[in-house]
Amino acid sequence: MNCDSTKFSIIDINGVLSFYDFESTGTAGNVRGASSQMKGEHLVTERKEVWSIIWSSDNPKLCALMEKNRLYVLRDFQPEEPVLSAGYLCDFTDLEVKAVLLDDILKDPEEIKSITEMIVEYEAKSLRDTRDFLTTVSLKDAVEFVEKNPHRRLWKLIAEASLDKLNF
């Protein structure tokens, strides 16, 4: 379930990921053929061969999922470019997905010097793009990008860049 309890996801036994939207209203036929208002909707969006999903803890429009050996971040059910990963998803906060390399831990637990080396962090595309904009284009263009993709982490980057440039 997402952070504001408006959407729900489930992976069935065949690895098919389905989404439900609790805010949508639709009509459902009853026994006598009349239709009635129904709260909630099974969304058409589906993904196949999914084995893990995690919703962002601070943005109800974001979730991350593992499909085969690729990590996808979905914003409003639209996928960003995938990243190769073998990690098991454990946290999605501030546009960063954390995954644990459990297969590596189980394969040779004696060789692990520190558990932190088994935790991998992936940044969402909007976070990577904002960092790129701040180094390659004007602050004004970066602000326009963040206005289209609002998130408190992105606004924090803008604020830090403004302070660095003394442009506020």
Would you name each region that the model predicts?
Residues 1-168:
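Extended alpha-helical assembly domains of large eukaryotic scaffold proteins
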